[in-house]
Amino acid sequence: ECGDWYARRLYQRDYPAYEAHLKKYGHPSQAGYKDVLRTWNPDKLDPAAYTRLFYEAGARYLFILGVHHDNYDLWNSRYQPWNSVNIGPHRDLLGEWATAIRRQGMHFGITFHHEYSWWWWQTAFECDSTGPYAGVPYDGRLVYESARGKWWEPYPLQWLYGISLREYKTMDEFVNRPEEGIFARHRDYARWYTTQWALRIEDAIEKYDPDFIYTDGNTLQPFCGIRTGTGTKSDAAQR
């Protein structure tokens, strides 16, 4: 589906993902990434078979993706309703991998990439600038509507896409990251976001007891990367 940044780039007309999404799912003002997740069904995925293959090739540990920048947890997440058990394949994919890896006698790690989700989804709040859908907002606008009567009820869409940062400061272009320090000026949102960031990591650790974890940034300051505002520090390392 056009790479691991497909979810962000399906809302950007200058990327191939936009055209690919248009042909397969429809215009992102009506069918966005949420609709990709709804129909996602990796029915050919067999963690046990892949684990045996990796072991025979010489691997003795595997890191498995827990969540990417798309903010969609690949386990039965306690703190993120947009997960692979509730929506999409209805499978605890991380749990399947953990079981297969342990049965093979290998070490097991989980990677977490949801540090960037707070800015990564800003493209979903944009719109086409030209063409028949010019000015029609993409489906990020739906985070401000009730989930009642929608196919994703009872899961708030805001928990997937987040909020439009235009609530805080008008930004006309999202090249990569918003300007430095935005969280420092909006402490309530920073506190909520960093708490959820840590709770989701702790939830996966408690459920699957990995030998290693990896997270973007580091375990002390989840928003320490280049040009990100540190906001409220959240330490998952204590667990």
Q: Where do the protein language model's features map onto the residues?
A:
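Mature catalytic domains of secreted/periplasmic carbohydrate-active enzymes
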Residues: 1-239
